[in-house]
């Protein structure tokens, strides 16, 4: 998708994707009907054991929701998945993965809508200035700061994703690159 295909707008403090018309294509199983089953954190001795067991479950769940590449395959060294937040919606399904890393946290969010026409307008807070477009595989990823953290947001068909946290712009780009590797 080009900048013209995914219309965006921003002000001094927010960034938003604008509504778009759908292609009419819908998956056989709608994301709103998804019901993945993730192991509870309490079942594991520590974050490392949880991360090693649950991340493959997350990958399988995302693969069942969309065939589009959305999850990074590279994370900063020492990153551990510590929490999975699920949000089944009438018009889709949302997952937020919370990682611990270097005494802080960062998040990976994936929202898969039933169709492009059902995509909500999401607002992302940002610092003054223009977001930096980072285009790979004809998909525009928008990188911006928000206070002392950085984020990247993008849409790929009926999927909206974000990376947010105490990550450098180079780390965000490396994570984005790994999605399509």
Regions found by a protein language model. Name each.
Residues 157-181:
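Surface-exposed amphipathic alpha-helical segments
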Residues 6, 10, 61-64, 175-178:
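Residues that form generic nucleotide/phosphate-binding pockets
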Residues 1-25:
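Membrane-interface helical sensory segment of bacterial ECF anti-sigma factor regulators
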Residues 34-147, 151:
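Short, solvent-exposed recognition patches
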Residues 17-42:
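Short extracytoplasmic
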